[in-house]
């Protein structure tokens, strides 16, 4: 019984226990209120269109009556008072449509029964031919900016996976009826260019989005198809300024009503956007976006005109898919540069790569972070000439392009990353110092200016370029991969990405700060590792905003220790990989698998053993200076853990200490300390290893990796 009680979750601090940080509940408007708001917006647009149609009909009818009176008067004068019936045969006529026509652009369920009756009566009154009005789009009918709103996206719109069956791109489960050929709609001519026979990236539309009554037949139309959106926009332009867009077919007004088949609940929960060339309305109450912002943009960029929201506008060129998405050669898996739990990286050309994300939210977060970093770094520091136009700002890699259809982002290409870099020499210690100073500056900039925490500082996420004449020298380094990044709590409900491709706005998820989802298990800062071991449900201990930056720099210190072990161990890199690093990553995979399967207790047990390997790393590199780290960690484990977990911890620590001996690095450490750059890196590692409990996160981040 005592063992079970001792294994319960407790605070990682040796002092008085305190409750973990519990974020306040999210205050989001109810689902019904969001639907009501979108319904009101659509009704306002419909009423504006009907008023425009009625005004045009009245004007044309009056002109028609006046002309008939003139013709009758001339007939009376010519025929001695005999009235003849005349018809206007030389006047081109156009039928002005009311509610029924406009319902092809908005949801039919937003109209009440009374409004439908009014629409039918208006259509009956306007059945005779009339002359169209010449009023412009800037008239009173469309001056509110809601003329011709179209529902552009639903939660079921985007779904992606790779096509392993054939070489030809196909959109599966898309049903076309009414004479349409699925093959023509999938692999045809898009944007005036013929699509290649082997596009490597495939978009799978799992759920039909909307049905249109076309000639009495239900035709399933893919709203995410570029051709259909272009056809709808071209038809609206061809109808002339000030006119109501015509249906896609030649059917009557009653046959043009739109019925949305997607789940309205998930639609309103995620995003529901109506847009045209003047305004983008969103399901976020009080937020409207200006699509004209895209005209001056070439990369994602933050628009700080709004105080309430951080809007990042994401442009897309018309031929982006032909130049990027269809140009990636994925025929051979050996071409793949990297693969992880969040996506794959493939080469595009000599200077660029594309990242194909597994989740759509991954792409949204990446481009939002890219726009935020690019804009905030613009006025901070001038870019080096070699990095201008590459998407690298303040040591942070950003996306230079995005395609939601294929879930692709474009990035600058680097030679390798720190994990795969295998040329480490003491003669190039000055380049290593510059690289880690750049990374520390990037972390401080990301936390202080952008107010975002990266939460995934690992050697795999540090990209480097090396000197081709001296592969041991690191020329530049950049931090990448914002898959786990979260904004500070004061940015909750404020981060939005607006996409030109779909005319939609996406909200960035609020911060959750679950420690089990933050950082790679092998590089997680020791204070957070202890909190997670005690409580798998623990969240980040937010007692002050400076804790975020201190935690990030502590993780960077773990990366520095990882690199120093490769640099200083006299046995060589191969022995380090098979021995030291194998022990560090031995239980990291088990922790990740347990987390995926929801076995949080097993994840906590694996992190306890990883803590033993982290402690062994510090003791090996620091020697006698690491005695305080070892004694404090052992006291923590004995005080907080059960006897069986203590025995497992001691057993694995003994195994690690037999492999990570200080004698293997002692001579190279002396050579390292003989240089100013080596002394700087060694002291930086010592300071980061001194952050061993929750209270240490309240320190001054300027003391870590000082300038």
UniProtKB/Swiss-Prot annotation:
EC number annotated for this UniProt entry? 2.7.11.1
Q: Which GO terms describe its biological process?
A: symbiont-mediated perturbation of host cell cycle progression; viral process
| Positions of the UniProt region annotated as Disordered | 1-33, 113-146, 176-198, 231-264
The impact of changing residue 244 to V is: In strain: Isolate clinical C005, Isolate clinical C076, Isolate clinical C128, Isolate clinical C325, Isolate clinical C327, Isolate clinical C336, Isolate clinical CL-1A, Isolate clinical E428, Isolate clinical E460, Isolate clinical E540, Isolate clinical E759, Isolate clinical E760, Isolate clinical E761, Isolate clinical E763, Isolate clinical FK-2A, Isolate clinical GR-3A, Isolate clinical HD-4A, Isolate clinical HR-7, Isolate clinical MG-8, Isolate clinical SN-11, Isolate clinical SW-12, Isolate clinical TH-7A and Isolate clinical TL-8A
What does altering residue 19 to E do?
In strain: Isolate clinical E460, Isolate clinical E763 and Isolate clinical TH-7A
| Record field: catalytic activity | L-seryl-[protein] + ATP = O-phospho-L-seryl-[protein] + ADP + H(+); L-threonyl-[protein] + ATP = O-phospho-L-threonyl-[protein] + ADP + H(+)
Quote the catalytic residue positions: 456 (proton acceptor)
Variant or mutagenesis effect after changing residue 469 to Y: In strain: Isolate clinical C327 and Isolate clinical E761 and Isolate clinical FK-2A
The outcome of changing residue 227 to D is: In strain: Isolate clinical TH-7A
Q: Where is the composition biased (Basic and acidic residues)?
A: 113-127
Subunit-structure text = Interacts with UL83.
Its protein name is Serine/threonine protein kinase UL97
The source organism is Human cytomegalovirus (strain AD169) (HHV-5)
């Amino acid at each position: 019984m005592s063992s079970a009680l001792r294994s319960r979750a407790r605070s990682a601090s040796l002092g008085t226990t305190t409750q973990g940080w519990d974020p306040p509940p999210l205050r989001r408007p109810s689902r019904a209120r969001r639907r009501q708001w979108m319904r009101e917006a659509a009704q306002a647009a419909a009423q504006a269109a009907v008023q425009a149609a009625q005004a045009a009909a009245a004007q044309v009818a009056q002109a028609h009556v006046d002309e008939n009176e003139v013709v009758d008067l001339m007939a009376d004068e010519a025929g001695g008072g005999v009235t003849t019936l005349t018809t206007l045969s030389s006047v081109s006529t156009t039928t002005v449509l009311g509610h029924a026509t406009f319902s092809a652009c908005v949801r039919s369920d937003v109209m009440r029964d009374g409004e439908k009756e009014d629409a039918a009566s208006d259509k009956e009154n306007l059945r005779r031919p009339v002359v169209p009005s010449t009023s412009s789009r800037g008239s009173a009918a469309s001056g509110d900016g809601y003329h011709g709103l179209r529902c552009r996206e639903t939660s079921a719109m985007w779904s992606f996976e790779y096509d392993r069956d054939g070489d030809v791109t196909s959109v599966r489960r898309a049903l076309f009826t009414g004479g349409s050929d699925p093959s023509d709609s999938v692999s045809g001519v898009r944007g005036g260019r013929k699509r290649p026979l082997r596009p490597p990236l495939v978009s799978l539309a799992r759920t039909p989005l909307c049905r249109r009554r076309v000639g009495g037949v239900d035709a399933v139309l893919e709203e995410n198809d570029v051709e259909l959106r272009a056809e709808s926009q071209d038809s609206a332009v061809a109808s002339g300024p000030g006119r109501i867009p015509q249906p896609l077919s030649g059917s009557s007004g009653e046959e043009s009503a739109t019925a949305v088949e997607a789940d309205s609940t998930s639609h309103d929960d995620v995003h529901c956007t109506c847009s045209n060339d003047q305004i983008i309305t969103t399901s976020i109450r009080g937020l409207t976006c200006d699509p004209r912002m895209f005209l001056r943009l070439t990369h994602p960029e933050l628009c700080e005109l709004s105080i309430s929201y951080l809007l990042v506008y994401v442009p897309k060129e018309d031929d982006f898919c032909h130049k990027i998405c269809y140009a990636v050669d994925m025929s051979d898996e050996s071409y793949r540069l990297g693969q992880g739990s969040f996506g794959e990286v493939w080469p595009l050309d000599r200077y660029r790569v594309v990242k194909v994300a597994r989740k759509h939210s991954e792409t949204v977060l990446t481009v939002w972070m890219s726009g935020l970093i690019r804009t905030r770094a613009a006025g901070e520091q001038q870019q080096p000439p070699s990095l201008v136009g590459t998407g690298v700002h303040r040591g942070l890699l950003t996306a230079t392009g995005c395609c939601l259809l294929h879930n692709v982002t474009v990035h600058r290409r680097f030679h390798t990353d720190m994990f795969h870099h295998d040329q480490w020499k003491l003669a190039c210690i000055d380049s290593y110092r510059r690289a880690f100073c750049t990374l520390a500056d990037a972390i401080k900039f990301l936390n202080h200016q952008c107010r975002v925490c990266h939460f995934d500082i690992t050697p795999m996420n540090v990209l480097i370029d090396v000197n081709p004449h001296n592969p041991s020298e690191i020329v530049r380094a950049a931090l990448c991969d914002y898959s786990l990044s979260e904004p500070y709590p004061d940015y909750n409900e404020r981060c939005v990405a607006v996409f030109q491709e779909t005319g939609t706005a996406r909200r960035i998820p609020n911060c959750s700060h679950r420690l089990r989802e933050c950082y790679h298990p092998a590089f997680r800062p020791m204070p957070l590792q202890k909190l997670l071991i005690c409580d798998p449900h623990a969240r980040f201990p937010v007692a002050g905003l400076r804790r975020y930056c201190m935690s990030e720099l502590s993780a960077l210190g773990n990366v520095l220790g990882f690199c120093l072990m490769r640099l200083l161990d006299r046995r060589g890199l191969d022995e380090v990989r098979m021995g030291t690093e194998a022990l560090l990553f031995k239980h990291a995979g088990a922790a990740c698998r347990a987390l995926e399967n929801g076995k949080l207790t097993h994840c906590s047990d694996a992190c306890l053993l990883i803590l033993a390997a982290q402690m062994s790393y510090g003791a090996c590199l620091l020697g006698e200076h690491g005695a305080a780290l070892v004694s404090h960690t052992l006291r923590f484990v004995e005080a907080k853990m059960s006897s069986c977990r203590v025995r497992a911890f001691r057993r694995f620590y003994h195994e690690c200490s037999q492999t990570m001996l200080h004698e293997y690095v002692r001579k190279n450490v002396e050579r390292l300390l003989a240089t100013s750059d080596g002394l700087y890196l060694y002291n930086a590692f010592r300071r980061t290893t001194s952050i061993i409990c929750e209270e240490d996160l309240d320190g001054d981040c300027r003391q870590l990796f000082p300038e």
